[in-house]
A protein has these predicted regions:
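Flexible, acidic glycine-rich loops studded with aromatic residues
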Residues: 385-390, 395-400, 406-548
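Aromatic, loop-rich ligand-recognition surfaces of beta-strand-rich domains
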Residues: 584-649, 660-698
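Flexible loop/turn segments at secondary-structure boundaries
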Residues: 72, 179-181, 207-213, 281-287, ...
């Protein structure tokens, strides 16, 4: 999937199509040139589009001409009949629907990551529809565009040339925290196809339950596919206990191997590849419950990590993966690799013996040993390993693909080392976050990601082609700890998945206002088809304070930190608390400063001279699911000389965790004169983080 090679093919493809249009005296504008109303109905936006005169009625008889095989013709006819039920494809119609492979797909050179095979050309006139592509994938996407253009049985005439920007355009669905029926997954595959997405990543195993039938290890589903507590929260509150199907109150389920074969086949008919994820070595409490012999020795507390020193662990994993590969033809197999604590390994005699025998110095290298061994096994079966970006720690397996979720830096570093990467940073791609003003939303996980923020993401950014060529694409992830129902799942997926789809497909994105107009239309289409998206028309939006710059006495003044802020949440550094900038609903937006040290927040602000003060206030962020809490104690001291301080205010607060998300302002009002103000905020018994954005003084 070398970028220059693709661009050559794409430009050649484009020049032929543009030349044909030029013969009619028209020029095909790029996406950035067109008027928004011209493509008001299309997501993702096509690479190039021109509106022409007239319309085509999709009713009555239409002559169907194609050069595909009989089986492919039947599939296309079924797709068209479903999309346009009032249209009859036969030989009697005067109007023509022509769908052609050019060159014939059996002669076309195709590779797994070649985006040109997904491109297509579409021309609609009052009497004819022409769709051309070099593969059935391209023809399929051309028909999807045709479906989106339809309005009450009519198609506006136009010319389109189109091909995706990225080869990988995916979504991950967490099936462990909450189990989703097969029919529900098939429904989401229909929506993915409509949006030209081509990868469904199923997170099939985790502490909350094993969801795939493994015939050699039946206890995985017999003992852990059901649990006590219908929701993930209830399960956690009741001690994370597993159950058997016949137990009273048991909740859960799993996919039989036939279920998964059905899902794979349904997806393949829509040119979607299903990628399975089997977590290892962490997030494996359910495995250890079913097969405790895979646990480390001398474990004194709850542990979710497989014992890497135990050779039976590798026998188990290889046997499981053999059954996985028999069901999923995907080139990629995801092995997780994230958030392993590794603590048990340090005390486990078998793990220590493994480290000594392999010359490993750290437990991170021990995990890398497992990853590399699994990669060799998968490579030997013609597959490629994908892992979350923790697999970068220790030593990256030679042929592994990294799924970068903890920001973009790891992904970029991966590409510079010559490895392929799939970008899925939490700030832009995690669909389990609040999508609007948090108090107005169902409980979500962590922070806030609006449709606009999601749409703003560009995986390659301004990276040079030599690096960008290793970015396979992007993926939206829906973790489902706080998503207990199917309607809620769709509420979190849509409309933000529309932004993921356009970010993965479109070369020259339009402005957000244009995209939002198109998203509103697609939202209505989804509702008409039985989906349950968030209603974008009711969106409240970003925190109002973030949209303005504050002016107060402390702006630009010197700040001394007696306790450091966290390196991974620095905001704007030493000036963050006096820069006049408020944070929004996202604690990772670069305006909130995070504190996790023993003393949490402890700073002194020098106003430069003694000044009268009537108000000192600070806003604090709370997200219980992210272990961020408002302070349990705030103390303010003042001084004229910076040496001798007097207490101005000292208050204790009860931290209310009944509300997952809030921004709380704590303030002192009165009258005092001072030059130095020391502000301290401490945590209570809950511990966790403290986040604030500004200490305001008036």
């Amino acid at each position: 999937m070398i970028m220059k090679h693709f661009l050559f093919l794409f430009l050649a493809f484009s020049s032929c199509f543009v030349s044909a249009l030029a013969a009619d005296g028209e020029r095909l504008p790029a996406v950035g040139e067109r008027l928004a109303e011209d493509v008001a109905r299309l997501i993702p936006a096509p690479a190039a589009y021109v509106k022409t005169e007239g319309e085509m009625k999709m009713t009555g008889h239409m002559r169907f001409v194609t050069n595909v095989t009989a089986q492919e013709r039947k599939a296309l006819q079924g797709l068209l009949a479903e999309a346009f039920p009032a249209m009859q494809l036969d030989r009697r119609g005067k109007r023509v629907l022509q769908i052609r492979l050019t060159p014939p797909h059996h002669e076309a050179k195709q590779t797994a990551n070649d985006r040109s095979e997904e491109g297509y050309q579409l021309r609609i006139t009052p009497r004819d529809i022409h769709i051309e592509a070099s593969s059935m994938k391209g023809l399929f996407y051309g028909v999807q565009t045709l479906r989106q253009l339809e309005e009450q049985g009519r198609l506006a005439c136009c010319d389109i040339k189109d091909a995706p920007k990225y080869a990988y355009r995916g979504v991950m669905l967490d099936c462990s925290r909450h189990f989703w029926p097969k029919e529900f997954i098939l429904k989401q595959l229909d929506a993915m196809a409509y949006l030209k997405m081509n990868r469904l990543h199923l997170h099939l195993t985790d502490d909350a339950g094993w969801r795939m039938e493994i015939k050699q290890y039946p206890a995985l589903t017999e003992k852990t596919a059901w649990r006590v507590g219908a929701t993930w929260n209830e399960w956690r509150e009741q001690g994370q206990r597993y159950a058997r199907k016949e137990d009273k109150g048991a909740a859960g389920g799993y996919y039989t191997q036939q279920d998964l074969k059905d899902i794979v086949a349904y997806a393949a008919a829509r040119h979607i590849t299903v990628i399975p994820e089997i977590e290892m070595p962490g997030h494996s409490a359910e495995v250890l419950h079913a097969y405790p012999e895979l646990q480390c020795e001398q474990v004194s507390q709850r542990n979710s990590d497989l014992c890497v020193g135990n050779e039976q662990t590798f026998v188990f994993l290889e046997n499981v993966l053999r059954e996985v590969m028999n069901i999923f033809p995907s080139k990629y197999i995801h092995i997780g690799g994230d958030e392993a604590s590794r603590q048990a390994w340090a005390a486990c005699p078998r793990c220590q013996q493994r480290m000594k025998a392999e010359g490993l110095q750290t437990v991170a290298e021990l995990q890398a040993y497992l990853t590399q061994r699994m990669e060799r096994f998968l490579n030997g079966h013609g597959r490629v390993l994908i892992g979350w970006d923790e697999i970068l720690e220790g030593q990256l397996a030679p042929n592994a693909v990294v799924m970068s979720w903890r920001g973009e830096e790891g992904g970029i570093a991966t590409t510079k080392a010559g490895h392929d990467v799939i970008m899925t940073p939490g700030r832009y791609c995690y669909l389990d976050r609040y999508q609007d003003y948090p108090p107005s939303q169902p409980q979500a996980f962590g922070s806030y990601m609006s449709l606009e923020q999601c749409y703003a993401y560009d995986p390659a950014g301004h990276l040079p082609d030599s690096i960008a060529k290793h970015i396979l694409g992007l993926q939206g992830n829906l973790w489902t700890e706080q998503v207990p129902t199917m309607a809620h799942c769709e509420y979190m997926l849509y409309p933000r998945l529309l932004a993921i789809a356009e970010n993965g497909w479109s070369h020259g994105k339009t402005d957000y206002a244009d995209f939002r107009r198109r998203a509103l239309h697609l939202q209505d289409v989804l509702v008409s088809r039985g989906y349950h998206p968030f209603d974008l028309r009711k969106e409240v939006g970003e925190r109002a304070e973030k949209k303005t710059v504050m002016q107060h006495l402390a702006v630009g003044k010197r700040v001394v930190y007696h306790a450091p802020y966290a390196a991974n949440y620095p905001a704007s550094g030493d000036e963050a608390l006096v820069d006049g900038k408020s944070g929004g609903w996202d604690f990772q937006d670069g305006a909130w400063q995070g504190f996790i040290g023993a003393d949490r927040l402890d700073v002194t602000i020098d106003l430069g001279e003694i000044k009268p003060l009537k108000l000192i206030k600070a806003a604090f962020f709370q997200s219980v699911s992210a272990e961020i809490y408002t302070p349990a104690e705030v103390e303010i001291l003042v001084s004229d000389d910076g040496v001798h301080f007097e207490q101005l205010d000292h208050r204790r607060y009860e931290v209310d965790t009944s509300t997952d998300f809030k921004v709380q302002t704590m303030e002192w009002c009165g009258a005092v004169k001072a030059r130095f103000i020391r502000y301290q905020a401490k945590s209570g018994q809950l511990g966790g983080w403290i986040f604030t954005d500004e200490i305001c003084m008036q």
